[in-house]
Design a protein with these regions (language model features):
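Juxtamembrane intracellular "pre-TM" segments in multi-pass secondary transporters
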Residues: 2-19, 207-241
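Helix-loop boundary and gating motifs at the non-cytosolic
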Residues: 9-69, 237-242, 246-266
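Intracellular juxtamembrane helix-capping segments at the cytosolic ends
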Residues: 44, 133-146, 343-357
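Loop-to-transmembrane helix entry
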Residues: 54-67, 185, 266-284, 398-400
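Glycine-rich segments within core transmembrane alpha-helices of 12-TM secondary carriers
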Residues: 71-73, 152-174, 369-380
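A membrane-interface helix-boundary motif in multi-pass transporters
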Residues: 92-94, 177-192, 385-408
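Structural signature of the two symmetry-related core transmembrane helices
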Residues: 93-109, 305-320
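Multi-pass alpha-helical transporter architecture, strongest
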Residues: 112, 195-205, 404-427
Length: 427
């Protein structure tokens, strides 16, 4: 049975409240998508020394993620804009979710089977294409289907699913890939889980309102995703920039964690795998504990104060990890980091949903995720180069220096949030 959409105006946000189960079904695919990237964060770090050598590992990760991000930046808003006007028996978004997910599974198999840096990069870039082909349309569901008073809760659920996906992906990669040594099985398993969550979405979500009338060619719609009119939405642009820097901070910790464990603390792969199970579990718990209170607080005091608090927690957390003399101390600061990440994931998405126009949500959400996708490559380009440069002097200091640089990203994210007008728009 499908999840019925809330009654809606011809254009604009629905008005009738949705049951909690319906909100959960709108969020489950976030788990599947993020499980892939959480797992690959570990798998690709584990493989990079063998693919390009220890001295070039940071640059190798940076190059691969930059190429993948360029692909995501082109695909996601373009396909999101096209899906706004798509008419099919399944609705506007579902065809793209199905096609993208099926190709994800195929490309993960190819990536798992590849043994050269060039082949791994090629499959990674193609995976970014297929994943964003699905994600661009999918993230239009909350603005399409959720009434304004439930956006905070829906965003909190989305945040929980994102974190759970990242954590479970890390678990799969750490247990199957590092501890048991089967990188191939770990990689393929990620695609299987994503496929299950996609099928749940396709089965249970009713997309509700139809596409608006299409008065332009498909080419014009696709290119309109990049129209300069977006610059007139100044609060939206400032929020995009703020999101970029916050996520650069989180991407640095996640993207360089295995290097940190190996080089800064001298852990073996088995020891690192165990810590990679514990640290994400701590992040998951702290995120879960902070997400829903943060969403409720944002409904009372506003979205921006909660995001400011998240930036502070993130900066203190990652700086503490970078300076920690031992893993137990680092884990204590991971708690602060997780609390900040949970608060941000719950509230940033709600603020974005509040301020964008409601008739072309696929386009605006697609562009927003361009900045989300760009955060990882930019962070790893800066962090990877920093790690290699400092590591040439003292190997263990490289990841620590990268984490301290990342603390600055959170501060910049807070500053860029100041010009954002948080008032809700329903047009």
């Amino acid at each position: 049975m499908s999840v019925p959409a809330a009654p809606a105006r011809a254009v604009g946000r629905p008005t009738a409240a949705l049951p909690l189960w319906h909100l959960l079904t709108l969020s489950v695919y976030w788990l599947g998508m993020n499980l892939i990237w959480g797992g690959l964060d570990v798998i690709l770090q584990a493989r990079m020394d063998d693919l390009v050598g220890v001295a070039q590992a940071g640059r190798g990760i940076a190059l691969m993620t930059v190429l993948g991000a360029i692909t995501a930046m082109v695909v996601q808003p373009t396909v999101g804009a096209i899906s706004d006007y798509t008419v099919s028996r399944w609705g506007r978004r579902k065809p793209y979710i199905l096609i993208g997910t099926l190709f994800d599974v195929i490309l993960l198999y190819g990536l798992a089977s590849s043994n050269t840096f060039v082949a791994v990069v090629a499959f990674f870039v193609l995976l970014q294409f297929s994943s964003n082909f699905a994600q661009g349309p999918f993230q239009g569901y909350v603005p399409d289907l959720v009434p304004a008073r439930q956006v905070g809760l829906a965003s909190a659920l989305m945040g929980v699913m994102i974190v759970l996906g990242r954590v479970f992906g890390t678990f799969v990669a750490s247990i199957v890939g590092l501890i048991f040594g089967n990188i191939f099985l770990a990689t393929v398993s990620l695609g299987v889980v994503e496929l299950v969550t996609a099928l749940m979405t396709l089965r249970w979500v009713d997309e509700g309102r139809p596409a608006p009338p299409r008065a332009r060619s498909w080419r014009a719609i696709a290119t309109s995703a990049w129209g300069r009119d977006i610059l007139r939405h100044r609060s939206y642009v400032w929020l995009l920039a703020s999101r970029l820097f916050f996520l650069m901070g989180t991407a640095t910790l996640v993207g360089l964690m295995l290097f940190y464990l190996r080089r800064s603390h001298g852990l073996t792969d088995l020891e690192a795998g165990l810590w990679l199970l514990l640290a994400p579990a701590v992040i998951a718990v702290t995120t879960g504990l902070s997400t829903f209170p943060a969403a409720r607080a944002s409904d009372r005091v506003g979205r921006k104060p909660v995001i400011y608090a998240a930036c502070l927690l993130g900066a203190v957390g990652i700086a503490g990890v970078g300076l920690a003399p031992s893993m137990p101390v680092a884990l204590a600061f991971v708690v602060l980091f997780g609390m900040g990440a949970g608060a941000f994931l719950a509230v940033d998405w709600a603020l974005m949903t509040d301020i964008i126009p409601k008739d072309t949500t696929g386009r605006f959400m697609g562009i927003s995720n361009v900045f989300s996708a760009a955060a990882g490559p930019i962070a790893l380009a800066v962090g990877g180069v920093t790690m290699d440069a400092v590591g040439a002097i003292e190997l263990g200091a490289g990841p620590r220096a990268a984490f301290l640089v990342a603390a600055l990203f959170f501060g910049i994210g807070a500053l860029l949030l100041r010009p954002v007008d948080p008032r809700r728009r329903d047009d």
